[in-house]
Design a protein with these regions (language model features):
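Solvent-exposed, non-transmembrane regions of integral membrane proteins
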Residues: 1-276
Length: 276
């Protein structure tokens, strides 16, 4: 009886390894990796390969909505001549989380007097100010006062990271440094899609980075978006991957796992026989 278990584990391990290796090798040759660019409100069934050739697919993706969760904006100092953040080796920043009204950057004490998460810039006769703007292209803006702790120099004004619709706004603190708000960094971005197949099925779902959708042998990954528009992007780029040999790779791995279980059972039986 123990001999049968050992024999079975040997066969499962070696056959499983053989199947997994052969399938992985063939899959590497037959794998399709395509890139598809979709636009809000329209279905797309064409994608390009790594050579730029256009390929028609047996499925179509319609982008219903695109959302981005962003990290809170930051305030930083830059060198007026080089544009580099300061200090150069270890740049400092003030993170404008909810409720933050004060911060320090090197010798400058900052006091936030007004924050507008959805803002638009408005040009006046002698300056640029920001007002609430709850529509596409809105940007983040703060009105602040900066006081130099060494010489008591005071500067105040609007600072904004800007958007594809409105320019960024910085404050020139002195001849050497300026206070800026870099572009906000994406924390999470996702696409709500509707997928159509030739068989007539319609599947709705959400695709995120590292959370692909799988349909008819295709894995659909969130790749990128229109970074010039940021959170207002109406374009989403997907990577579609198809490996026809992947089920065989999994089958080989399962066989090896089963072989390991058989080996464990065989060892347990042998211990029981030795005790007897």
């Amino acid at each position: 009886f123990p001999f049968k278990w050992r024999r079975l584990s040997f066969l499962l391990n070696h056959i499983g390894l053989f199947v997994a290796l052969i399938a992985a090798t063939l899959g590497n040759a037959d794998m399709q990796r395509l890139k598809m660019t979709t636009r809000m409100g329209s279905a797309e069934w064409r994608a390009t390969d790594d050579k730029g050739q256009l390929i028609e697919l047996p499925l179509a993706i319609e982008l219903k909505d695109f959302t981005i969760d962003e990290y809170p904006p930051k305030l930083m100092l830059i060198d007026n001549e080089t544009g580099r953040t300061l200090p150069e080796k270890s740049p400092e920043h003030v993170l404008l989380e909810e409720g933050v009204i004060k911060g320090t950057l090197q010798d400058w004490q900052l006091t936030i007097e007004q924050s507008i998460p959805m803002a638009a810039s408005v040009a006046t006769e002698d300056t640029l100010k920001f007002t609430e703007f709850h529509s596409m292209g809105a940007t983040y803006a703060v009105y602040l006062k900066a006081v130099n702790q060494k010489n008591q120099t005071t500067k105040e004004g609007w600072v904004s990271c800007g958007s594809f619709l409105f320019p960024y706004k910085a404050i020139r603190l002195d001849s050497l440094t300026s206070l800026v708000m870099p572009e906000r960094e994406p924390q999470r971005f996702a696409s709500e899609v509707k997928i159509y197949t030739q068989e007539g099925t319609i599947t709705e779902g959400t695709i995120e980075v590292n959370r692909p959708m799988e349909i008819e042998g295709w894995k659909i990954y969130q790749l990128s978006y229109d970074e010039t528009k940021g959170r207002w992007s109406d374009v989403s780029v997907f990577e579609l991957v198809r490996d026809p040999w992947l089920p065989f790779v999994y089958a080989g791995i399962i066989m090896m796992m089963a072989g390991a279980v058989c080996l464990f059972v065989s060892a347990q039986k042998r211990k029981e026989e030795d005790k007897a």
